Regions:
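Short linear clamp-binding motif
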Residues: 3-10, 391
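Helical scaffold of the NTase/Pol beta-like nucleotidyltransferase catalytic core
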Residues: 10-76
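Acidic side chains
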Residues: 11, 102-104, 166
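Helix N-terminus capping/helix-initiation residues
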Residues: 31-36, 111, 286, 306-309
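Metal-dependent nucleotidyltransferase catalytic core
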Residues: 37-53, 93, 97, 106-164
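Active-site nucleotide-donor binding segment shared across nucleotidyl transfer reactions
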Residues: 48-116
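Structural alpha-beta junctions
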Residues: 53, 57-58, 124-129, 207-218
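Catalytic cores of NTP-dependent nucleotidyl/adenyl transfer enzymes across multiple folds
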Residues: 144, 150-388
């Protein structure tokens, strides 16, 4: 069944930036019809080229060594990747994408700390032709993580717009983002055409990896467990041998606990494993290798880059039992009691974004979800305090 009718998708624009004077701003949604996409491309390209110039002047090396990746749109992630792509017709984009919540741009991971220092100096100053830098949500260099979420005020002729720019720490080779860096945070225009947000592609990948790598013949102990002292994890889930991270790739999640005899410890006939520390996991970033792991084929690889394509791949290569397990995992990731809120100010918008992907999944795979309305309503009742109010 369909819970919601079609809506045009809006996204992002949730960040609050606080500058070093203690003043704050929330990001606005950027109306692409008002700004005009061709103008959007020109203005933001110039902004990043100017920022690159300032960065090189301060640190004696460029933030982006190959500026052609700005002009071509290659350095951008999420929906920004196709909004900024000069090869995609602007009018065609506007049919399916009326607003931009943020601008996602990749930055070499090793340059993030220097970028933060530069931004600190630029507070309240002009950058590009029509922007003033306001601030970001990272109070110091130790809090950077994988993103700097900043606000630049765009002085447009129709009025100021607080634009959220997410600088994403990414892996670069030869001054360009790697294939996996693009894949891990990318967004497909094919998905935008059916008004489905990129997060659904990554969510579905995570679910598929967990289902394909599930191993009911092992049990999982706590990370601190040893062969002499084993404490089992309190979970009802089937253990998963692998996990998927948009930043790191396909990771081997578990390691066996080895006894004094050199063999894997067993309890009740099941081998005992424990979770590896994140830094100790081995990750696979080769996309063709990840594809073969999931589907046991090299065919139709091009479908791997979009949610729409991934649903097609499930239909082509996965049996009904696997698909049902993926459905259960996917719904729980969207609407489990601790699931992430996507639109932090508006439960209705959050529901629209999530149901777009889930309804498409059900329809294309000919699946049903009894009592879907009740299950979704339960989530919003449980998570009602997770939604913020704009001040």
């Amino acid at each position: 069944m369909r819970l919601l009718d079609y809506f045009l998708l809006t996204e992002g624009g949730n960040v609050e930036a606080i500058n070093f004077l203690g003043k704050s701003k929330f990001a606005d949604k950027i109306d692409l019809g008002r700004i005009k996409i061709k103008n959007f491309r020109t203005e933001f390209s110039q902004l990043f080229l100017d920022l690159n110039k300032k960065f090189k002047s301060k640190f004696k090396y460029p933030l982006w060594g190959d500026e052609s990746i700005i002009k071509s749109g290659f350095v951008f992630n999420g929906s920004t990747s196709y909004i900024m792509d000069p090869n995609i017709n602007a009018d065609e984009i506007l049919k399916f994408k009326t607003h931009a919540g943020d601008i996602d741009i990749m930055v070499p991971s090793e340059s993030m700390s220097d970028l933060w220092l530069l931004l600190r100096e630029l507070e309240g100053k002009k950058v590009g032709k029509n922007f003033t830098y306001f601030g970001n949500n990272k109070p110091n260099q130790n809090a950077l993580g994988t993103q700097i979420n900043a606000i630049f005020v765009f002085h447009h002729s129709s009025g100021d717009i607080n634009c959220q720019i997410d600088f994403e720490a990414s892996e670069f080779e030869n001054d360009r983002p790697t294939d996996f860096a693009k894949f891990g945070h990318g967004s497909s225009f094919e998905d935008a055409r059916v008004e489905i947000k990129a997060l659904h592609h990554k969510y579905l990948l995570r679910c598929l990896v967990s289902v394909v790598s599930a191993n009911p013949n092992i049990i999982v102990a706590t990370p601190a467990s040893t062969a002499e002292k084993i404490k089992l994890k309190k979970t009802q889930d089937t253990p998963k041998m692998y996990g998927f991270s948009v930043d790191r790739g396909l990771g081997y999640s578990l390691e066996p606990i080895i006894g004094k005899d050199g063999k894997i410890v067993e309890i009740d006939g099941k081998q005992v494993y424990k979770e590896k520390k994140t830094d100790d996991k081995k990750y696979i970033k080769d996309l063709s290798e990840i594809f073969r792991f999931l589907f046991n084929t090299d065919n139709n690889f091009s479908k791997f880059y979009s949610f729409v394509g991934l649903v097609d791949l499930l239909k082509l290569y996965c049996d009904k039992e696997t698909i049902k397990k993926v459905q259960k995992s996917y719904f729980r990731l969207l609407f489990g009691d601790k699931s992430q809120v996507i639109e932090s100010f508006d439960p209705k918008s959050d529901c629209i974004v999530k149901m777009k992907g889930y309804n498409y999944f059900l329809e294309k795979l000919n699946l049903k979800h009894p009592n879907l309305d009740n299950d979704v309503n339960h989530y919003y009742e449980v998570r009602k305090n997770a939604f913020r109010k704009k001040i």
